[in-house]
A protein has these predicted regions:
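Intrinsically disordered, low-complexity regulatory regions
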Residues: 1-96
Length: 96
């Protein structure tokens, strides 16, 4: 039986919001194309730098838009997740 974790910073709820945000990006019109720019950049071997650049961009942009700051954080987190995916691909391709 798993012990219930009492998250101090509502991480469980925030992770749910992150997943919902990522799901929404896959439902946008340009995500329905056969290939996305991110796929081609990763296939060309430039994924890590691309993701790190976008993480920096959204971190630096955070707080500068009125009322839309959460979207910058969600994008930053999504690029961090893609970076983790790239690292797993470099190891053995399997996420355990």
């Amino acid at each position: 039986m798993r012990k219930k974790i009492n998250y101090k910073f509502n991480e469980d709820k925030i992770l749910k919001l992150i997943k919902e945000n990522i799901d929404a990006t896959y439902n946008q019109h340009y995500a329905n194309e056969k290939y996305q720019a991110t796929d081609m950049i990763l296939d060309a071997g430039h994924g890590e730098g691309f993701c790190m650049g976008n993480i920096m961009k959204y971190a630096m942009r955070y707080g500068k838009k009125r009322g839309h700051n959460d979207s910058d954080l969600y994008k930053l987190i999504h690029y961090a997740i893609i970076s983790i995916y790239i690292n797993y691909q470099d190891w053995d391709g399997e996420i355990k």
